[in-house]
């Protein structure tokens, strides 16, 4: 059985606010902790009315403080938005507070629109600088030399696991060349999944951080007690994707019984294309879909995610997936 992990974006639902979203994230993480999931990751997004995890490192600390065993990390920190030294200090602090429980996943996308990226002081050469920034960040975690003028405190000498995240061959090749674990964002960017995984494994060079390739991929999961309820729960995320694609992001809408009453066939097809890798339905249906995804990819670890309006339904979905996991 491979490890199962969870990705959460701290969704803000219609009628709710950021405080509710963060409270529900903690409740979800506590359920994942209780159910034996390996990791609970949070994503950096900015200027998104429906996502409360913009200050990712702070939310990680909140979740780690409210859980006992599960690893907590970033899925991910968008490194070009930050100075590598600051990231090392933040995650060095988290590792000091919660030793052996912190992961640092790194991405190179802005996690927002162009205007917000500029407000973050992100300049567009930042993505081109990403490989250098990753190497610099790794170096900040190395033990400091006696005469080193600048060091990460806390951070220097701490072994915080660093992952590269991505949705393209670029990140896959870089992760392989640096000998780092790799996580692919197949939950919203399915097109290049298999190509990227193959490239990562082919390019992998053993490092002092990782002896052999370790690949994780994400899949949307809407697990419920019946197939019909799973399909209904998935309609919130379909609506959200359509709104985002038309430049109108908002809070997460409630599910509907019949998605065809509010979206056009073209909109539904577009959303389903982005959500190609999804497991939707009752326990047996979800088990079959997860089995197929793991067999297709040969991944070493599975990450599940899913934007649902009702947090009780999200927790129930994790419970069903945990039950399914034990049957592998």
Please tell me what each predicted stretch does:
Residues 33, 60-68, 95-102, 176-177, ...:
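Acidic (Asp/Glu)-rich catalytic clusters
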Residues 1-70:
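N-terminal beta1-alpha1-beta2 module of alpha/beta enzyme domains
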Residues 8-23, 77-85, 156-166, 274-283:
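Active-site mouth loops of central-metabolism enzymes
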Residues 124-151, 192-299, 326-328:
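An alpha-helical appendage that flanks or caps ligand/catalytic pockets
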Residues 4, 32, 36, 44, ...:
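Conserved, mostly hydrophobic/aromatic
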Residues 4-8, 40-42, 72-74, 102-106, ...:
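Hydrophobic faces of well-ordered beta-strands that scaffold small-molecule active sites
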Residues 3-18, 80-142, 182, 190:
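Flexible, glycine-rich active-site loops centered on histidine and acidic residues
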Residues 172, 176-191, 196-197:
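A conserved active-site cap/scaffold subdomain adjacent to cofactor or substrate pockets
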């Amino acid at each position: 059985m491979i490890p199962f992990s969870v990705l959460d974006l701290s969704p803000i639902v219609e009628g709710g606010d950021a405080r509710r979203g963060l409270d529900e994230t903690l409740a979800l993480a506590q359920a994942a902790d209780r159910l034996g999931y390996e990791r609970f990751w949070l994503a950096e997004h900015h200027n998104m009315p429906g996502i409360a995890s913009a200050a990712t490192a702070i939310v990680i600390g909140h979740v780690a403080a409210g859980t006992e065993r599960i690893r907590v990390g970033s899925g991910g920190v968008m490194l070009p938005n930050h100075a590598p030294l600051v990231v090392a200090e933040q995650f060095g602090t988290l590792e000091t507070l919660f030793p052996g429980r912190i992961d640092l996943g790194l991405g190179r996308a802005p996690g927002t629109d162009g205007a917000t990226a500029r407000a973050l002081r992100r300049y567009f050469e930042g993505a081109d600088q990403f490989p250098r920034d990753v190497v610099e960040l790794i170096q900040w975690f190395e033990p400091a030399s006696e005469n080193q003028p600048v060091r990460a405190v806390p951070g220097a000498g701490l072994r915080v696991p660093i992952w590269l995240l991505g949705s393209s061959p670029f990140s896959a090749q870089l992760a392989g060349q640096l000998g780092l674990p790799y996580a692919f964002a197949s939950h919203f960017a399915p097109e290049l999944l298999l190509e990227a995984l193959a490239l990562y494994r082919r390019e992998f060079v053993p490092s002092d951080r990782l002896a052999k390739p370790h690949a994780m991929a994400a899949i949307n999961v809407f697990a419920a007690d019946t197939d019909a309820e799973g399909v209904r729960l998935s309609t919130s995320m379909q609506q959200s994707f359509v709104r985002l694609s038309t430049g109108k992001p908002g809070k997460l809408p409630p599910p509907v019984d019949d998605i065809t009453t509010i979206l056009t066939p073209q909109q539904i097809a577009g959303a389903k294309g982005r959500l190609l890798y999804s497991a939707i339905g009752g326990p047996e249906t979800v088990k079959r879909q997860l089995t197929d995804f793991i067999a297709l990819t040969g991944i070493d670890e599975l990450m599940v995610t899913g934007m649902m309006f009702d947090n009780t339904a999200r927790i129930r979905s994790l419970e069903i997936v945990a039950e399914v996991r034990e049957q592998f």
